[in-house]
């Protein structure tokens, strides 16, 4: 995914794409001991939900990754700002690892090859795909490489 990104979006805002899939990775890759200290760590993964507004473009799809499912009412709130919330919902894929443990989402995903396979399937289509991480460490790079 990342290999062709720069060539496809050389002079524009990378989030102003006309078509394609954005894989949202709101992972905090810090040591587990540090993550345990953060009150409400589970909600930190929701801080990139503003990216759902990219669905205003009909040819954009989003795969949003989380440790645990995000409340539907929260997702609906963001989609309500779009001209076609139902159309946007059909192009939004919320995937949860189902793991509330205080460790990085990226680590959880790397431990779940079946979930990575599902992300890969969802990224197949026109316009290609790219990963939009919260922060980048060697783990996020490894995840992007495993996704292709």
Regions inferred by a protein language model and the residue ranges of each:
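ATP-binding N-terminal substructure of ATP-dependent carboxylate-amine bond-forming enzymes
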Residues: 1-148
């Amino acid at each position: 995914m990342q290999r062709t990104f720069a060539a496809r979006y050389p002079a524009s805002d990378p989030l102003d794409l006309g078509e394609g899939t954005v894989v949202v990775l709101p992972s905090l890759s810090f040591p587990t001991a540090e993550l345990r200290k953060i009150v409400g760590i589970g909600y930190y993964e929701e801080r990139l939900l503003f990216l759902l507004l990219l669905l205003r473009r009909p040819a954009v799809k989003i795969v949003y990754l989380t440790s645990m499912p995000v409340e539907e009412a929260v997702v609906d709130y963001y989609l309500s700002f779009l001209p076609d919330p139902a159309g946007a919902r059909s192009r939004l894929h919320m995937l949860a690892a189902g793991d509330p443990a205080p460790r990085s989402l990226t680590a959880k995903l790397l431990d779940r090859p079946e979930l990575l396979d599902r992300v890969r399937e969802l990224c197949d289509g026109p316009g290609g795909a790219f990963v939009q991480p919260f922060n980048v460490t060697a783990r996020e790079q490894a995840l992007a490489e495993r996704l292709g």
